C-alpha cells in the first residue's frame, strides 16, 4: 500500500496520514467540498465523485494551489461547493444528476444510473438545469 483516500471530514486526518506515511506514500483528499483544505493539509491529490461534472474547475483549483493564489482558490472552492449543493439537492441520486448535466453541457448521452441508485425524476429537471447553468457560469468566471 502506497496511499490512502481520506473521506472523513476533519482535514487534520489528512495531516496525520501524511505525517505517518512520509514522502513515499500519498494521501488523497476525498470530500470534494474541502479539496482546497485537504490539499493544504498534505493531500497529494484528490479522488472525488463530482470531478466528472466539472473537471476543469478542479484542475483550475489545483493550479491555483500550486501557484499559491489562495484567495482565488478559496473563491473557486466556494463556487464549487455551491454547485455540489445543487447536484445533491435532487430526489434522484447525485450521479444521475451529473449524467444529465453532462448531457446538457457536453452533449454526452450516458443513460441513467443503475439500481439501487435512484434515477433522476421529471421533478428533478429544474435542479439539473440549475446545476448545468451554475457550472457554465463558474467556468466563465474562473477559466
PLM features: residue spans?
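Catalytic alpha/beta core domains of metabolic enzymes, predominantly
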Residues: 1-81, 87, 91
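Short glycine-/small-residue-rich flexible loop motifs, especially phosphate/cofactor-binding loops
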Residues: 35, 99, 129
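Conserved short secondary-structure transition element at the edge of the structured enzyme core
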Residues: 39-43, 81-115
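Flexible C-terminal active-site loop/helix
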Residues: 107-142
Amino acid at each position: 500500500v502506497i496511499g490512502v483516500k481520506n473521506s472523513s471530514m476533519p482535514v487534520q486526518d489528512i495531516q496525520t496520514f501524511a505525517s505517518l506515511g512520509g514522502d513515499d506514500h500519498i494521501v488523497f483528499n476525498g470530500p470534494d467540498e474541502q479539496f482546497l483544505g485537504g490539499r493544504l493539509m498534505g493531500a497529494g491529490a484528490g479522488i472525488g465523485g463530482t470531478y466528472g461534472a466539472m473537471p476543469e474547475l478542479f484542475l483550475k483549483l489545483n493550479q491555483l494551489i500550486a501557484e499559491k493564489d489562495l484567495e482565488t482558490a478559496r473563491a473557486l472552492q466556494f463556487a464549487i461547493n455551491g454547485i455540489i449543493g445543487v447536484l445533491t439537492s435532487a430526489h434522484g441520486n447525485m450521479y444521475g444528476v451529473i449524467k444529465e448535466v453532462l448531457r446538457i453541457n457536453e452533449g454526452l448521452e450516458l443513460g441513467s444510473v443503475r439500481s439501487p441508485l435512484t434515477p433522476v425524476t421529471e421533478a428533478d429537471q429544474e435542479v439539473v438545469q440549475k446545476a448545468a447553468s451554475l457550472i457554465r457560469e463558474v467556468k466563465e468566471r474562473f477559466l
